[in-house]
Regions:
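Charged low-complexity "KEKE/polyampholyte" interaction tracts
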Residues: 354-358, 364-482
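A short beta-turn/strand-edge loop motif at beta-sheet boundaries
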Residues: 496, 509-517, 570-571
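Long, well-ordered mid-to-C-terminal structural blocks that present hydrophobic/aromatic surfaces
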Residues: 285-381
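Acidic, glycine-anchored loop motifs typical of Ca2+
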Residues: 495-496, 529, 543-569
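A contiguous strand-loop segment
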Residues: 25-135, 155-294
Length: 599
C-alpha cells in the first residue's frame, strides 16, 4: 500500500531519539468528575532542545482556493487543503530546524491538542509510508478542521490510512468541551484511540502508556485494522479470555519495555504518580495508564506536578536542571494548563513562557486571542518560516518582552541560591494574576449575551493586561538577579574560529572585579538555548583575564579572553545571541550577558 520514504523516516527517527533521551514532554489529564473545576483539565510541558523560541498566534478562519495543496516538512506528502479552515490559537515551537511534533492548538470550536513523543518502537514493526508520509500535518490539520475530539481522531486516522506516519510514535491528547481522547500513533498506520473517562486521571511522559485497553468498548476505544491480530500473531498479546479483547496491552505489544524503564521516563512517571496517588511505584510495569483518584485535582495541583524537580536537580557546579530526570527539565521551554469550558471562548489557559519551575503561569483565554507581544512574527510569516526558518529570526531582541521570562530562567539556572525565593515571588505573582479570573469570566458571560464579539474583545484585553504585568515582574526579577553589566567586545564571533574573543564584566559599587574567580568563569549560550547534552562545565573557559577600565567611568572592570569557537560552538550561525558569562566573586554567583552576531 505504501512506498517507503527512507529519508523522512531516518530524519524523524534521529530527531526523536535524541529528543526523547534527554528532553521530552509530560501531559496530565484530569477528568471532569475528579476535577475541582467540574471540567476537564489538561496540563502539558513542552520540551525541545536548542535555540527554541516559543511564540503564540491567532490564525483566523480562512477560505481556500479549489485544488490548493499543503505541504509541511520538505520530505512529507502533499495534502489537499479543505475549502474552509477554522480559526485557532497556536502556540508555536519555533526552531531553526523546524518542529514537526511540538506545537499546541486550541481552535474556535474548543478542540485542544498537545502531544508526547513515544519513540523507539520494535524495528520489525516499521512500515512503509506513501509520498513521504505525514508528521506535522496531523496536528495542524486537526486544528484547522476538527469541530470535536472524535472528528479530530477521524481526520488523523484518515491521514494515517492514506499516507502513513513517518515518525516512530507519538501520543496525541485531544480534548473538546465535552470529552477528551488520547490517540497513540505507531509509525506507519498502526494506532489506538481511547476516551479518557470522566473519573480518571492520566499521566504520560515519553513512552506509550495505554494498557488494559478494552477493544470491545465501541464508544470509548478505536483501533487500526489488524492492530490486535498482529500483536496476537507475534506473541506479544495473549487475551486473558481467548477471543475477548478486553485487556489489550498496547504499550507492551508495540514498544520495547526498555523505553518505560529508561531513567528519563521512569523518574518522571515515578514523580508524577507519587503526586497523583501518594504511592511510590518501583517497577516500570507497575505504572498505570490511568487511575480513579480518591481526591479531586485543580489547576494548582496540576501546576505542582508540571513544576516537579528530581533529586538530581540543584547540584553545585551544574546548571540547576542539568540531568533532566524531573518533570520540569533542562529543555522545558513552555508549560500550560488548560481548563475546558462548554463555550470555547471561556476556555482558560495558564501558560509559562519559559521553564515552569522558574517562571509564572500567566492566565490566558486562548480563543480570545493572545497578546500580540507574545509573537514577533505574524501568523502567516510564522507559518512560512516554520520549516524554512531564517537564522536572523532567532536573534536576541531586547524589545521582545518574552525574553524577560527566558532571561530570568537562564539566570536562576546558575544562581541556585535564588531558586526558592524566586518561586515564592512567582507564586505570589500568580495569585495576583489569577484572583480576578472568576470575575472576568462572569463579566464575559454577561457580555456574550449581548455580543459575543464584545466578550471576546474584553477577554483579549485581559490577556494583554496580564501578560504585561507578568513581563514587568519578570524583567524586574531579572535585573535583580543580574545587576552587573556584561559586554562582548566584538561585533561577531566565529563559531569555527581559533581567534580570541574578549568579554568584559564591568565593575560597579557592589562588584570589585579583583575578587572575581577566574577558575569559576565560563561563557557560552544560556541554558534555555541548548539541548540536554550541553552542560555548564562544557562551556568555554577563559585563557586569561585582565583588570582595566573598559568604559572610562573610573571603575575597574575585568576582561576575559576566550577562544571564539569554544564560546560559540553551541550557537546558531547567522543569529545575534545573548552570550552569557557565568562567574563568581567572594563565592557569590554572577550571571549576565552581552550580545554578538554568530558567524
Amino acid at each position: 500500500m505504501f512506498s517507503k520514504s527512507l529519508l523522512s523516516v531516518a530524519i524523524a527517527s534521529a530527531a526523536i531519539a535524541f529528543g526523547a533521551n534527554a528532553l521530552a514532554c509530560s501531559t496530565i489529564i484530569v477528568g471532569k468528575d475528579v476535577s475541582k473545576t467540574g471540567t476537564v483539565i489538561i496540563g502539558h510541558n513542552e520540551d525541545n532542545g536548542g535555540r527554541i523560541i516559543a511564540q503564540q498566534h491567532w490564525v483566523p478562519a480562512q477560505t481556500h482556493k479549489a485544488g490548493e495543496m499543503i505541504k509541511f516538512e520538505k520530505s512529507a506528502a502533499e495534502i489537499p487543503q479543505a475549502e474552509k479552515t477554522l480559526g485557532f490559537y497556536w502556540t508555536q515551537t519555533f526552531s531553526p530546524t523546524g518542529a514537526s511534533f511540538s506545537d499546541g492548538f486550541v481552535n474556535e470550536k474548543g478542540v485542544t491538542i498537545v502531544s508526547n513523543a513515544c519513540s523507539q518502537i520494535f524495528p520489525e514493526n516499521k512500515e512503509k509510508v506513501k509520498d513521504g508520509g505525514v508528521g506535522y500535518g496531523i496536528r495542524r490539520i486537526m486544528a484547522e478542521r476538527a469541530t470535536t475530539a472524535r472528528e479530530a481522531i477521524k481526520i488523523a486516522t484518515d491521514l494515517l490510512d492514506k499516507y502513513g506516519y513517518f515518525s516512530n510514535g507519538r501520543t496525541y491528547t485531544i480534548a473538546d468541551p465535552k470529552e477528551v481522547w488520547q490517540l497513540a500513533i505507531h509509525q506507519g498506520n498502526k494506532w489506538v484511540a481511547r476516551k479518557v473517562k470522566d473519573n480518571e486521571v492520566v499521566y504520560i511522559p515519553n513512552n506509550f502508556m495505554m494498557n488494559k485497553v478494552d477493544v470491545t468498548d465501541k464508544d470509548g476505544v478505536m483501533v487500526s485494522p489488524g492492530l490486535v491480530e498482529k500483536a496476537i500473531k507475534d506473541g506479544k498479546y495473549k487475551p486473558a479470555v481467548e477471543g475477548q479483547w478486553t485487556d489489550f496491552n498496547f504499550r507492551e505489544a508495540y514498544q520495547p519495555a526498555k523505553l518505560r524503564e529508561a531513567q528519563y521516563n521512569f523518574s518522571r512517571n515515578q514523580i508524577a504518580w507519587k503526586k497523583i496517588t501518594g504511592k511510590t511505584f518501583n517497577s516500570a510495569d507497575e505504572f498505570p495508564y490511568s487511575v480513579v483518584p480518591n481526591k479531586k485535582f485543580g489547576v494548582e495541583d496540576v501546576k505542582k506536578i508540571l513544576r516537579a524537580d528530581s533529586k538530581e536537580d540543584g547540584k553545585a557546579g551544574e546548571w540547576y536542571h542539568e540531568k533532566g530526570f524531573g518533570i520540569s527539565r533542562p529543555t522545558t521551554h513552555e508549560s500550560v494548563v488548560y481548563v475546558m469550558d462548554s463555550n470555547p471562548l471561556f476556555i482558560q489557559a495558564y501558560k509559562t513562557l519559559a521553564r515552569p519551575s522558574e517562571t509564572p503561569y500567566v492566565p490566558l483565554y486562548p480563543v480570545a486571542k493572545p497578546a500580540q507581544a507574545t509573537a514577533f512574527l505574524t501568523w502567516d510569516e510564522a507559518t512560512k518560516q516554520h520549516f524554512n526558518a531564517k537564522p536572523e529570526s532567532f536573534n536576541y531582541n531586547p524589545d521582545w518582552p518574552v525574553w524577560s521570562f527566558i532571561n530570568t530562567s537562564n539566570a536562576i539556572e546558575y544562581i541556585h541560591q535564588a531558586y526558592e525565593k524566586n518561586m515564592k515571588q512567582v507564586r505570589s505573582l500568580e495569585k495576583e494574576l489569577g484572583k480576578t479570573v472568576a470575575k472576568e469570566l462572569e463579566t464575559a458571560k454577561e457580555l456574550a449575551k449581548i455580543s459575543p464579539q464584545k466578550a471576546q474583545e474584553w477577554l483579549h484585553s485581559k490577556n494583554v493586561e496580564k501578560f504585561d504585568k507578568a513581563q514587568e515582574a519578570m524583567q524586574e526579577a531579572f535585573e535583580k538577579l543580574s545587576p552587573h553589566e556584561v559586554l562582548v567586545l566584538a561585533d561577531s564571533i566565529n563559531s569555527k574560529g581559533d581567534e580570541n574573543v574578549t568579554i568584559a564584566l564591568l565593575g560597579d559599587k557592589k562588584l570589585k572585579v579583583k575578587e572575581v574567580n577566574l577558575a569559576k568563569t565560563v561563557a557560552g549560550p544560556g541554558r534555555s538555548s541548548v539541548g540536554g547534552k550541553v552542560s555548564l562545565t562544557s562551556l568555554a573557559k577563559p585563557s586569561s583575564s585582565e583588570v582595566k577600565d573598559v568604559n572610562g567611568d573610573g571603575v575597574e572592570d575585568i576582561v576575559f579572553t576566550f577562544t571564539a569557537k569554544d564560546v560559540a560552538k553551541d550557537m546558531l550561525p547567522g543569529a545575534i545571541y545573548d552570550v552569557w558569562l557565568y562567574s563568581e566573586a567572594k563565592n557569590k554567583p554572577i550571571a549576565g550577558f552581552g550580545t554578538a552576531l554568530i558567524q
